[in-house]
């Protein structure tokens, strides 16, 4: 069981959404942010750096959006769907864009393939959480 799920299960108040879906999204957001940061580092070490500029930019944007969304979704007190919903929507959009870009490099760079997978998983987890919001 992930730490996100353990924290939700031990939360003294009411969690307003399905804890399993929320925990999966929190875990995916964390993994995606980390994968994007690591991919940027790997991209900067590639010989063809000029070809990686768009990938680097999207990975940085994706990591930032995922990190912000991770923080908001991890807090349950005074939950406000009007704040959470647009962040999740932004996360879906940037994860799709970043995943698409990393996918273009996946055949040449294994780190891009891994990042693409993290982006796709996060995009799906955010979609699933969005579907449960009231």
What feature does the model see in each segment?
Residues 1-134:
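Amphipathic alpha-helical hairpins
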